[in-house]
């Protein structure tokens, strides 16, 4: 049974669908997930701890036996999973979404300056993530695999610390985009492109939170 003293990130690791519940009440299970459920709930207004625990335990009870839980994968298999489930889809989404973000800023930015700032923040986020993922694929992940295989990797802790620092910076950019868009709620007058951009940015946020959680709280723990 999940209780108030359980660590938020650990709950999501054990029961991935719990991420949806934490997300719905604004609790960070990603870079800020190393706190108890009770402590996290106290930081949020209008979060009833007992109700939250009830919802989480419903997820625990309905957890499907035999369904893939990445925490049971070894390092090399987990890396392959991360690359196929997150790196490849993120690259594709950046390629497809960027023209819409640019169009939104160009067409509506003159009357809504925050959309210009949104594009600038998105570009920083996108470029940072693309560089980060490429470095992981080319340099960092091979080091983690070597470490798993018993080879000496002198800078393994530095590798992990640097990646976590990148993730924190990524999280800050996601917060800024959410704030600029009022949690991705388009105004009444928003056109189709506007609504499309907000919808897909929100989905991008969800995907990135899951991605970072899996690396910070599952992958890196296997090699630290």
From Swiss-Prot:
Keywords: Cytoplasm, Iron, Metal-binding, Stress response
GO BP: protein repair; response to nitrosative stress; response to oxidative stress
Entry's Gene Ontology molecular function annotations: metal ion binding
GO CC entries: cytoplasm
Domain of life (superkingdom): Bacteria
Main location: cytoplasm
Cell compartment(s), UniProt: Cytoplasm
Matching InterPro entries: Hemerythrin-like, RIC_family, ScdA, ScdA-like_N_sf
Keyword Nucleotide-binding: no
Homology family: Belongs to the RIC family. ScdA subfamily.
Matching HAMAP family: RIC_ScdA (MF_01156)
NCBIfam families named among the record's database cross-references: FeS_repair_RIC, PRK13276.1
Function: Di-iron-containing protein involved in the repair of iron-sulfur clusters damaged by oxidative and nitrosative stress conditions.
Assembly and interaction partners: Homodimer.
Listed name of the protein: Iron-sulfur cluster repair protein ScdA
């Amino acid at each position: 049974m999940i209780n108030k003293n359980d660590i938020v990130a650990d709950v999501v690791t054990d029961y991935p669908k719990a991420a949806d519940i934490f997300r719905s009440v604004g609790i960070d299970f990603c870079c800020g997930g190393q706190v108890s459920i009770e402590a996290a709930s106290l930081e949020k207004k209008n979060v009833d701890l007992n109700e939250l625990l009830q919802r989480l335990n419903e997820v625990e009870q309905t957890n499907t036996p035999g369904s893939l839980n990445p925490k049971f994968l070894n390092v090399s298999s987990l890396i392959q999973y991360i690359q196929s489930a997150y790196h490849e889809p993120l690259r594709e989404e950046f390629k497809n979404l960027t023209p819409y973000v640019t169009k939104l800023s160009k067409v509506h930015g003159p009357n809504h300056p925050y959309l210009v700032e949104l594009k600038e923040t998105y570009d920083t986020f996108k470029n940072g993530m693309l560089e980060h993922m490429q470095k992981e694929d080319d340099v960092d992940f091979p080091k983690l695999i070597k470490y798993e295989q018993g080879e000496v990797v002198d800078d393994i802790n530095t590798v992990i610390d640097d990646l976590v620092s990148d993730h924190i910076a990524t999280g800050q950019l996601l917060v800024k985009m959410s704030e600029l868009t009022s949690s991705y709620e388009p105004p009444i007058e928003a056109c189709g492109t506007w609504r499309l951009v907000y919808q897909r940015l929100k989905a991008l946020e969800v995907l990135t939170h899951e991605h970072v959680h899996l690396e910070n709280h599952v992958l890196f723990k296997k090699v630290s």
